[in-house]
């Protein structure tokens, strides 16, 4: 009995210790000054940081570990030049525990980044904010030499091998002369955005995001009112400019963005790298989209709402020729269309979907869609069977047969139609016309 009691006491103590340790680990380190924030980022024991007030920083914050930063509704602003945050290694997760806090910005127009103006700003932003970044030039060595990223990453710069996860908060009013006004993702960098907003940011290309690594946009991510101001060969994508691996899904939205290249106000996607693959599975794009298929088959589309059209995205439309229901059109690129449920039509049998109105060329649902197409339903008249309970002489009138008029017959002779029916015993019976 004593042993059992002692075991229970020890178990309780152990649970208390583990609970206390877990609580201590999960409690964020509170910061309200640049010094406190810089110190917390440099402390390897600190894995979670929470702002307790607005903080102005004079230099770029450098992340070299796995850490969560909670903006907590406050403003993190760089007063000097450079990126607000540079993720050198590890993973930075951005969250915001006070999304109802309100801040004001002024939109000066002419493709300029929004400016923090808490007194008279007309652009209202809900939640914590990262702002003021102007980008920088970064150099990295790899197996083939040195890579130079010029004047990029106004808000957050994601270095090769580093990761950025954005679940909440806002990146607003950041800029870069070359690329990635809001976020710059470098070769082998990784960016996942499932929440929060990137807005009022500008760059030569990729006003909101410039991706040369792997970027995933999903759920409630929003990119709005960003602009690509450059006119060079690589200056595309007011909202997003992607050259490598991009996945877009869920209810994410890109809206109100502009670009000097008017084909890509919302987004520009190409796959210039040999291993690059991009997939558009959802999202809403309120602005022109340009998918550059010069690298054949590397960009696929299976969903999404393209409000202002999209170059490189094709539509499969269905014409049921009187049948119901009418299937919804499908957005596709380099993927097969999904065969809809067969429509129905009174008095007819559905044969299949065809690419021409005359219904002579059947459509192959296993082949990838590489152009817009309208598919037509083909119908054949359903066979008719007649039954007459009386005994009538069949005149075998050939003209009547051609018109398809019903035949009467002796009920003892069976059905007048060459058909086969299986009895419950599996025996085949053939109905014949009586002579």
Residues of each region from the PLM?
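C-terminal low-complexity, Ser/Thr- and acidic/Pro-rich disordered "stalk" regions positioned immediately N-terminal
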Residues: 378-408
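Acidic Gly/Asp/Thr-rich repetitive segments characteristic of extracellular carbohydrate-active
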Residues: 25-52
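Secondary-structure capping and domain/repeat boundary segments
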Residues: 310-390
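Right-handed parallel beta-helix
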Residues: 71-74, 91-132, 140, 144-145, ...
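Short glycine/acidic-rich loop motifs that flank beta-strands on beta-rich extracellular proteins
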Residues: 58-60, 78-82, 104, 108-113, ...
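Sec-dependent signal peptide cleavage junction
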Residues: 18-28, 404-411
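Extracellular beta-strand-rich solenoid/capping regions of secreted or surface-exposed proteins
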Residues: 43, 56-68, 76-97, 101-104, ...
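A cross-kingdom C-terminal cell-surface attachment/processing module
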Residues: 411-433
């Amino acid at each position: 009995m004593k042993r059992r009691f002692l075991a229970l006491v020890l178990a309780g103590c152990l649970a208390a210790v583990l609970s206390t340790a877990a609580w201590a680990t999960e409690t964020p380190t509170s910061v309200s000054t640049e010094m406190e924030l810089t110190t917390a980022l440099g402390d390897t024991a600190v894995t979670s940081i929470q702002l307790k007030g607005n903080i102005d920083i004079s230099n770029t914050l450098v992340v070299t570990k796995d850490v969560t930063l909670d903006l907590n509704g406050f403003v993190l602003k760089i007063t000097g030049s450079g990126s607000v945050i540079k993720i050198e290694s590890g993973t930075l997760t951005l969250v915001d525990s006070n999304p109802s806090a309100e801040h004001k910005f002024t939109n000066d127009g002419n493709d300029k980044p929004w400016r923090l103006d808490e007194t008279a700003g007309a652009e209202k932003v809900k939640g914590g904010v990262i702002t003021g970044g102007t980008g920088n030039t970064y150099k990295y060595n790899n197996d083939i030499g040195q890579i130079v990223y010029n004047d990029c990453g106004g808000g957050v710069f994601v270095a090769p091998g580093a990761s950025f996860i954005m679940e909440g908060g806002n990146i607003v009013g950041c800029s870069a002369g070359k690329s990635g006004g809001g976020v710059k993702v470098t070769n082998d960098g990784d960016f996942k955005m499932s929440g929060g907003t990137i807005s009022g940011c500008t760059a030569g290309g990729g006003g909101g995001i410039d991706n040369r690594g792997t970027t995933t946009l999903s759920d409630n991510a929003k990119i709005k009112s960003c602009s690509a101001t450059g006119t060079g060969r690589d200056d595309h994508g007011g909202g997003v400019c992607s050259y490598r691996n991009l996945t877009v899904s869920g209810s994410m939205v890109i809206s109100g963005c502009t670009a000097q290249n008017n084909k890509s106000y919302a987004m520009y996607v190409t796959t210039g790298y040999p291993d690059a693959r991009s997939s558009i599975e959802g999202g809403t794009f309120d602005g022109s989209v340009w998918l550059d298929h010069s690298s054949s088959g590397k960009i696929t589309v299976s969903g999404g709402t393209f409000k202002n059209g999209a170059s490189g995205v094709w539509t499969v439309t269905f014409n049921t020729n009187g049948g119901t229901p009418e299937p919804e059109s499908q957005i596709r690129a380099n993927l097969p269309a999904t065969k809809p449920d067969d429509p129905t039509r009174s008095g007819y049998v559905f044969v299949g979907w065809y690419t021409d109105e005359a219904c002579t060329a059947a459509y192959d649902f296993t082949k990838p869609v590489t152009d817009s197409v309208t598919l037509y339903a083909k119908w054949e008249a359903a066979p008719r069977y007649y039954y007459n309970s009386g005994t009538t002489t069949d005149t075998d009138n050939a003209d009547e047969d051609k018109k398809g008029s019903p035949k009467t017959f002796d009920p003892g002779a069976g059905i007048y139609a060459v058909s086969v029916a299986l009895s419950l015993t599996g025996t085949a019976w053939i109905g014949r016309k009586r002579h």
